[in-house]
Amino acid sequence: MGYQKPKGTADILPGESDQWQLVEKTARDVFARYQFKEIRTPLFESYDVFSRSSGDTSDIVSKEMYDFMDKGDRHIALRPEGTAGVVRAFVENKLYGPEHQKPYKVYYMGPMFRYERPQSGRQRQFHQIGVESFGSESPAVDVEVISMAMRLLREFKITDLKLAINTLGDAASRAAYHEALVNYLEPHFEELSDDSKVRLHKNPLRVLDSKDAKDQEIVKDAPVILDYLTDEAKVHFNTVKTLLESLNIPYEVDTEMVRGLDYYNHTIFEIMTSNKVLGRGYTTVLAGGRYNGLVEQLGGPDMPGVGFGLGVERLLLLMNAQNSDLVAAPVLDAYVVGIGAETSATTLHLVESLREAGLTADRDYLDRKPKAQFKTANKLNAQFVVTIGESELADKTAHVKDMTSGVEITVPLTTLEADFAAVKNELKAQEENE
């Protein structure tokens, strides 16, 4: 039996990888407009980076983390999400210092790892694109990040988008709400799922996020955090809503929304679509929020942050469902056909010269007959086919055919190697004269 990829992973093959490159390039272009710069952090970190930031009660830490003891007896974890590693790098490299412009804006792309049941759009190794903006408590930064997220999805031509927002308040708001929520849930303790029983006193907000049907029934009548906001938290959330309206970004307030990671506070948001490829109803494509205590929690100063992440696999499922011609067929500038073994050195030199000039060029390496080589040129969508046979070799010329117009000319090899643009112009002029 041959070797197979691990369960929950995927090989991204040529052709498919073109789509990934398109997604990454589009994201980089959008982020550049907002002055976000790329950051690259390790695929693995100290286990504590994720347990401290994500919270011991989160599913990621308690159930899904790939962690192990390395040969130096250090507790290591493969990154399950991007934010914690970026915050660790922000703190370790003292990017919070006054010499660095604030907000300090970064984005990341790359693989993440979670041990969960593989399904469509969800793998154990999956890829995330995310952004983080550090250093400003302004609600305008929340809205800038949301606006950028909406713009990014529009660039990907995702339709039927819905923005849902909520607030988790500041520390005082959450403390008051925690108390009210615990008081509400305690009489239902025996009815709660085992996970929710554990979370009830550690982080009762996570009970609201339970997927258990009985838990969901219980929390339907739970207190709403909007009723427990401090005046400052109310002002922050109201300003976010006002600024979204000023940008004509429609939104819904979803008071039941909580994020799956424990570090969020104030504004949280999800962008959803109703495309059936991800399941029934509205499904989240991108999610994020504000995390004002996370930098301090990982050893830095008190510095606010806000960001989002999206899964690339799920995004590509959507993009392919909505647009079958996601990436245009690649075009080859020139394919060089060699007729006879003695032409090999000349055709090799020619394709290298064309590549040196910035063109895409290829030739046969399987000693195939001319007919098979011409067939390959067509398959590769070559714009021009250059043919060198015994007579061309003797005359130091080449036969060039424009595959779009069908026009053919013979030119000196030196001209072809030195100025391919002139050859194209000659072909065009001849086409116009015919």
Curated annotation (Swiss-Prot):
ATP-binding among keywords: yes
Domain of life: Bacteria
Alphabetical list of Gene3D superfamilies matching this protein: Anticodon-binding domain, Bira Bifunctional Protein, Domain 2
Compartments it resides in: Cytoplasm
InterPro entries in the cross-refs: aa-tRNA-synth_II (IPR006195), aa-tRNA-synth_II/BPL/LPL (IPR045864), Anticodon-bd (IPR004154), Anticodon-bd_dom_sf (IPR036621), His-tRNA-ligase (IPR015807), HisRS-like_core (IPR041715), HisRS/HisZ (IPR004516), HisRS_anticodon (IPR033656)
Catalytic activity line of the entry: tRNA(His) + L-histidine + ATP = L-histidyl-tRNA(His) + AMP + diphosphate + H(+)
A Gene Ontology term for the protein's cellular component: cytoplasm
Keywords, comma-separated and alphabetical: Aminoacyl-tRNA synthetase, ATP-binding, Cytoplasm, Ligase, Nucleotide-binding, Protein biosynthesis
GO molecular function, a single term: transferase activity
Primary location recorded for the protein, binned into one broad class: cytoplasm
This enzyme's EC code(s): 6.1.1.21
One of the GO biological process terms: histidyl-tRNA aminoacylation
Quaternary structure and partners: Homodimer.
Family indicated by similarity: Belongs to the class-II aminoacyl-tRNA synthetase family.
Protein name (database record): Histidine--tRNA ligase
Source organism of this protein record: Latilactobacillus sakei subsp. sakei (strain 23K) (Lactobacillus sakei subsp. sakei)
Gene label: hisS
